[in-house]
Each structure stands twice: as C-alpha cells, then as structure tokens.
Regions:
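Nucleic-acid endonuclease domains
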Residues: 1-73, 78, 83, 89-210
Length: 210
C-alpha cells in the first residue's frame, strides 16, 4: 500500500517544477489544477516518469481505490483503507486556502453526505486518514508543496457539524420562503414570479494564510 513516505521519496527522486510541461509530456490537459492533481497521483503511484499512458493507468489503478470527481471530495483515495487525498492550489505561501462547501476534515468517514456513492462503495471502509496536498503555483511553476494530515491541523467533525447544523436550522426557520431538502445549508425554490429559479445557500470554509 502506498503512503505519504513513498510520495515524498518520489518527489526527491523525480521533482517536477513546470506543471504545464509535465502535463503535456503525459498527453493530458494542462489546466493547472488538474495538472497538480495528476502530479499528486503520480508521486503516490510511482509514475512520475512513466510516459506509456497504459502502464501509468494500470499502476495508478493498482494504488488507488478511488480517483475522484469534480463535485465531491476527496480527489482520490489509496487502496486497502489508505488515506484520502484532497489537492489544493494557492498562488503564494501566505494565501488563504478555500475548501468550498466542504468543511476541514481530521478524518474522512464513509457516512459523510458530502462524498459520492462511488467513493463510499469503492471498497469496504469506515474511516480514513485525510491528507491535504497543497501546491504553491506561480503560473505553471510549482514553487513548493506541503502535505499535512487532517488530524494534525483540523478539529474533529463534531466541531464543524455543530456550527453547520445551527446555521442550517436557522436558515430553514425563515418564514415566507419555500425551502427544499438539500445537503447544503439551504435551497430556496421559486425565487422569481415564474417559479423557474432556485437559490442555493452554500458555505465557504477557508484556512487562513499565515
């Protein structure tokens, strides 16, 4: 099973600083967020220098149980109950780190309403370590990268869920508005006279830069 030590060793063995060139050499889209996610997958799978796309895909599938989607955390999960990985890019070391509607996680739990069915069912699991992999990008240049376990940086889930629950309950008690069931903080139906517009109420969790 791959782990964060394997990833660090791979970075030392084969550092890559130009993500655009790296992504292009692997015949993949060079959008920088996607390129950083690809690089993170490769350092865990040991495929940084692998140019044969079939070999690369095979090795990645041997290491990862889940490879993510655009709408739900995490970005990937290692096999055999290994860590879940969330990849984030920032533009300077002191930038705030936006987690969007997903609150910080010390651990990832299979019962979370934020994850997809594919993530939940990829293998039998209850909870996983959470790794935040944060790359500092200047254009397509990867200036630095940090990987931190969620349990070393985040509070337990009850802390965030208590606040989220209080806000969600408060929003839902507003009178004269038609609410619908949602996993977000709220959803308001029939915002306009025609009843064809709805409003999503979402949180934005942010780690403050230092």
């Amino acid at each position: 099973m791959s782990n964060i030590i394997n990833a660090i060793i791979e970075i030392v063995k084969a550092p890559k600083h130009k993500l655009k060139e790296y992504s292009t050499s692997h015949n993949r889209a060079n959008q920088m967020g996607a390129a950083l996610e690809d690089y993170i997958k490769d350092i865990f799978a040991g495929t940084v220098g692998e140019c044969d796309i079939k070999v690369r895909n095979r090795k990645i599938n041997e290491v990862f149980a889940y490879l993510g989607n655009q709408n739900n955390p995490p970005d990937s999960m290692l096999k055999d109950g290994g860590a879940a990985i969330e990849v984030k890019k920032i533009e300077s070391p002191n930038s705030a780190l936006a987690l969007n509607s997903s609150y910080p996680k010390a651990k990832l739990f299979s019962g979370s309403t934020m994850i997809s069915a594919a993530c939940r069912d990829c293998e039998k699991w209850t909870e996983r370590d959470m790794i935040y992999a944060v790359g500092v990008l200047n254009g397509d240049n990867l200036c630095s990268m940090a990987m931190v376990y969620g349990e070393d940086y985040c509070a337990d889930k009850e802390t965030y869920e208590r606040i989220r629950g209080a806000i969600k309950t408060g929003v839902g008690q507003i009178q004269g508005i038609e609410f619908a069931e949602t996993n977000e903080l709220g959803r308001v139906n029939r915002v306009d006279p025609l009843g064809i517009t709805y409003l999503r109420v979402r949180g934005m969790c942010i780690f403050l830069g230092r």
